[in-house]
A protein has these predicted regions:
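The substrate-binding groove and active-site-proximal loops of carbohydrate-active enzymes
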Residues: 1-9, 34-46, 102-118, 141, ...
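Carbohydrate-binding surface patches
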Residues: 243, 249-252, 257, 295-336, ...
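Acidic/aromatic-lined carbohydrate-recognition and catalytic surfaces
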Residues: 30-95, 166-175, 180
């Protein structure tokens, strides 16, 4: 729902997941689901935030929220900081050649400034009072920007400043799950997960973009606990694109649904969600471990990926193009012997697959094969 977030809509989304998805295989192995408020939650009162968290808990969900600790979106230098009224925003900006550092429409703030620590303390206290257990920290790169100087004179580089600020975040938010977005890869010890592809939506180009990040960043789930490939949107796309988008999520790490599931949200999006977000065989793959590209030596997004999971091997092939394509499963490249007999099933269609024959993938679609 992007910038249309309201308190009633948030409750409706929680209820939609409870009534339509959680009882139909869209949940973690412990039966939990995370419901996150994104940008816009600050229009809620504290009582509404607490009520939202309580609704999530009643629905068997864990509530999440959003914050951008190292940015000033207002860019009003003379404004007073709400959580540190002895300072104005001009006091906390990072300056380069005497000018505020600006990126993506926001000014970067100094992670070492005491006013920023005061904001962290008060924001974490608010989130904790309300009961939030998950925080998406966005636009983190602002905290790593270079500057003429920092409040703390011992800091000499942007990454030093970022590391200082992240240590403070860990101090105040260390009992919550932290998901980083638009952030440096390192230092990595302050968060559980990191988004490796941002603003991915509903089309096959979004799948290709996501898989480009996985092609060359699959290993980052060895650094963080999970890779996050951003949300999956289903409305206004073909069903093949829906399958491809969902597959791109389950083989990356975090599996996030992004349509508007409030009562006024897209009917098509809800129908597609109940159809495609509830495939038990597909959803069981989403255990937070990234697939690896089979080749990984090109300059574009790879389209074939695999993961060995005990005695089960998963093989995925995407078709990013408009026309159908045929592919022979590269048995040797995925560690299989041509002479061995294997059972193979395509998980979206449920069809049995003969691995000795070419597989046809329609345009803007995917084949997700389980081999046992």
């Amino acid at each position: 729902m992007q910038f249309g977030l309201t308190y009633p809509k948030a409750l409706e989304v929680s209820d939609f997941f409870k009534n339509n998805l959680q009882n139909n295989h869209f949940c973690n192995t412990d039966n939990t689901v995370y419901i996150g408020l994104d940008s816009g939650w600050n229009s809620f009162s504290e009582q509404e935030l607490t009520a939202f968290v309580n609704r999530c808990k009643a629905n068997g969900q864990i509530a999440g929220v959003y914050w951008t600790p190292f940015t000033d979106w207002g860019r009003q230098a003379e404004n007073v900081l709400h959580d540190a009224p002895e300072y104005k925003y001009k006091d906390v900006y990072l300056y380069a050649n005497g000018q505020p550092q600006e990126l993506d429409g926001a000014y970067a703030v100094d992670p070492t400034h005491p006013a920023i620590e005061a904001q962290m303390k008060k924001t974490s206290e608010l989130f904790r009072r309300c009961g939030f257990e998950y925080v998406k920290m966005d636009f983190m790169t602002h905290g790593a920007m270079e500057a003429d100087h920092w409040y703390n004179p011992e800091i000499q580089t942007g990454i030093q400043g970022y590391n200082y600020g992240m240590a403070l975040l860990n101090k105040y938010f260390g009992d919550m799950y932290i998901n980083l977005s638009i952030s440096p890869i390192f230092p990595a010890q302050y968060a559980q997960s990191r988004r490796i592809a941002c603003d991915a939506w509903n089309k096959i180009k979004d799948t290709e973009y996501t898989m480009n990040a996985v092609s060359y960043g699959w290993w980052i789930d060895r650094v963080y606990q999970y890779n996050d490939a951003d949300h999956v949107v289903l409305k206004d796309a073909t069903e093949g694109e829906n399958r491809a988008r969902i597959t791109s999520a389950v083989i990356t790490g975090l599996y996030i649904a992004g349509d508007d599931f409030s009562e006024g949200g897209s009917k098509e999006g809800k129908e597609r969600a109940t159809k495609y977000l509830t495939n038990e065989d597909v959803n069981l793959i989403a255990n937070g471990v990234s697939f690896r590209p089979i080749e990984g030596i090109g300059t574009n997004s790879e389209n074939q990926f695999m993961r060995q999971d005990n005695n089960t091997l998963y093989y995925v092939v995407f078709n990013y193009g408009e026309e159908e394509m045929s592919v022979n499963v590269p048995l040797e490249r995925i560690g299989l012997n041509h002479s061995e007999t294997r059972n193979a099933k395509e998980l979206w269609s449920g069809a049995e697959i003969d691995l000795s024959k070419a597989i046809t993938i329609p345009g803007k679609d995917v084949k997700l094969i389980r081999i046992q």
